[in-house]
Amino acid sequence: MANRSRERILKKRDSTPAIQHRNSSAELQNIVKRNRASEKGGAYAVCCAHPIVIDAAIHQAIEDDSMLLVESTSSQVNQLGGYTGQTPAQFAHFVHSAARRIGLSRDRILLGGDHLGPFPWRDEASSRALKKAFGLVRACVLAGYGKIHLDASMACADDAKVVPENIVAQRAATLCAAAEDAFKSLPEGAAAPLYVIGTEVPIPGGELGAGETPVTTTVEGLNQTLRIFKQAFEQRGLSAAWQRVVGVVVQPGVEFGNDFVIEFDPARARSLSAALPRTPALVYEAHSTDYQSPHALAQMVKGHFAILKVGPWLTFAFREAVFALSAIEREMLAAKKRGKLSRVREALDQAMRRKPIYWRSYYHGDEGQLRFARAYSYSDRCRYYWHEPAVQAEIERLRSNLKTSSFPLTLVSQYLPQEYDAIRAGQIEQTAEAIIRHRIQLVLRVYAAACGIRAQPDLFQMPPN
C-alpha cells in the first residue's frame, strides 16, 4: 500500500512540471488594474512558436526584468500536434526548458492559448469540431496555460456563414466550462485561468486585402458582446470565471496586409477607449498590431488596448537577419573563392512551392510577384516553413560558414547597420546567433517600451505626445 501511495505521489509530481505559478498570472491582473486606473502600463504577447524567437523573447524578459507572455494558437499547437507537431504539454515544456537554459525563472512566464476553439476543425460538423475544441482547452489548462482566449466565432461545416453572436457566446461558455473543469484537477496552489473573450477577431494568421479598411469596434457592439457573453457564462454557472475575464478582443482600427500597414488612429478609437466597462475589470486586447510604429503602440496602450499581440513581425525580423547574413556569406566566400555557399532563400522557396497550403490564398500575381511575396510580404507566410528539414540544413550550413570564416565588420555595417552598432558598442557578440537574436529583440523592445516596461526603443524614435 505504501509503495502504491508513493507511486501516486511521484506520478502527481511528474505530471505537474508546467503548472502555472501565481506570480505571472497575478502580474497580468495587476497590469490590467493599473492600465484601467491610469492609462499606463500594458503587456505584449509573443504569439510565435519559433525556437529562436522564443529565445530572443526570454533574453528580452531578462533584460527588462519583466514577465514573459507567450501564446500559441490552436493551429500551431493542439492536442493532435498542430502544424508545429507539438501538444500544449510539449510546447510548455519547450518554453520552460528554454527559460531554464537561459536563466529566466519559471514564475516569470505566463503561457496563453490564442484562438482556442474549433478553428482547426472548422471543416467538420460543429458538434465534432467543438468536442475537439473542448479537448484542446483542457489540454492547455492541464499543461499550465494561464491565459485562455475563448474563440468560437468561426463557422463550422454545418453552420451558417456567419455564426450568430449568441451561439458564439454559448459555445465560448462551454469552452470555459471545460477549462474550469480541467483546472479542478490541478494541484493546490495553481492559479485559476484568466480568460479573454471577443468575436471581432481576424482569422488566425489572416490579414486584410489591399484597399480594405478595418471597421473599428463600436461601443454598442462592445456592450452587446459583454451582455451576451455574461448571460451565457451565468447560464452555465460560470459567474466566478466571468470575474476572471481580463480582456475582450476588439478591433481598434489596425491591420496589415502583404504590402501595407494601417496605422492606429486614436481619434477613430476614442469612443471605444472611453467605454471601458466597469465590470468585469478588463482591458482591450488588440490583435494584428504587427508593424505599428512605436508611437502608435504607445497610444494604443494609453487608450486601454493594453494587451498587444505580436507574431509575424518577429519572424519577419528573423527572416531579415537570415537573408542579410546570407548576403554577407556570399560576399565573404566569393572574395575568398572557397567553401560551399548555403542556399537558404532557395530552400525556403522550394519548401513553400512544395506545400503551398499556407500561402496560396494570400498571394496573387504572376510567378515573379509570387516569389517576391513568398519572401518579403508583411504577412510573412514563410514563417510556416522554417522548420522544414531542408531549410534547417541550409541555415545550419550558413551558420557553419560564418563560424568557420570570421566575417568582416564592414559587411555587417553594409547589411545589418543596427547590429553593427551593437557589436561596436560591445552589446552583442559578432556571431550569427547574436545578430539574429538582436534583430528580433529590436522589435520586442518596441513593444516593451509601448507597454511602459522599458525606456524608448532602439528601432525607431517616438515622436513627442
What would you call each of these model-derived segments?
Residues 40-51, 117-131, 213-216, 283-287:
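Active-site mouth loops of central-metabolism enzymes
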Residues 42-47, 68-71, 109-114, 146-150, ...:
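Hydrophobic faces of well-ordered beta-strands that scaffold small-molecule active sites
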Residues 9-43:
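N-terminal amphipathic alpha-helix/helix-capping segment at the start of soluble metabolic enzymes
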Residues 48-53, 83-94, 122-139, 169-171:
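Glycine-rich anion/phosphate-binding loops
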Residues 273-458:
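Flexible, acidic glycine-rich loops studded with aromatic residues
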Residues 86-107, 111-113, 165-189, 266-280:
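Alpha-helix-loop-beta-strand connector modules within alpha/beta enzyme cores
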Residues 68-87, 150-165, 257-258:
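Glycine-rich, proline-tolerant flexible connector loops at the mouths of alpha/beta enzymes
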Residues 57, 114, 151, 300:
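Conserved, mostly hydrophobic/aromatic
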